[in-house]
Amino acid sequence: MAEKKKSSLNGNRKIERPSGFLAIIISFLVILSILTQLDLKPNYSNILEDLSFLNENIIRLKINAFIWLINAILIIFLGPSVLMTFLPHGRSSSYLAAFLISATGILYLLFTANCFNIISVVKEYIALVDTTNSFLPSLAFNLLITRTNLQMIAYTLTGISAIVLGSLFARTGYLPRFIGWMSIIGGLIYIAFGWFDPESLVFVAGRVIFVLSLLFFGSYLLLRGTINRKSDIINPPEN
């Protein structure tokens, strides 16, 4: 009986452990990015105040940009890692999940590049002696608008990725189903509130649920691994 239960565990632990460790690192980096982010609603009439605010918090902005640079690269690698983890189970949805995850990482790379551009513009503007006819405020405003749009699109891609990956767990039980349902709920909130009300308590709750699902996902992959349900069907436990 013990041998049959043991045989139901997926043996591809060399892939599962790094995937789990990667997901755990990403979850903690997401938390750090939330704690260091600067929320600005771009308004051209207040752009000079925004530039002053960004200059006062330039170190925090740099830290946030570097966190997202590292996290974006890790998210890109998480895509193929998820594919290699779940493809042996014969699920084609793992292709879609891997594509969406890597696409989210690429989008966050663009977001990070935008953040570094904002930092450069802020430094150049503050260094000016005469700012009367400077084009930098207009450039900064456009960069802030782009930053906001990239963030909203990233919320949507994150939500779709969470729903696709969560549905895989919820339907198959390769990982505990509660992780799948947490991922689905967090993903739905990301999509529904990311564009319209990202400052609401509901969206904050959705982010907490999503990060916890990612942390549980990584922990189970790292410590226990997936469960191969096919072997249980082919070789049902003896009474």
Stretches with model-predicted labels:
Residues 2-239:
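Hydrophobic, aromatic-enriched alpha-helical segments typical of multi-pass transmembrane helices
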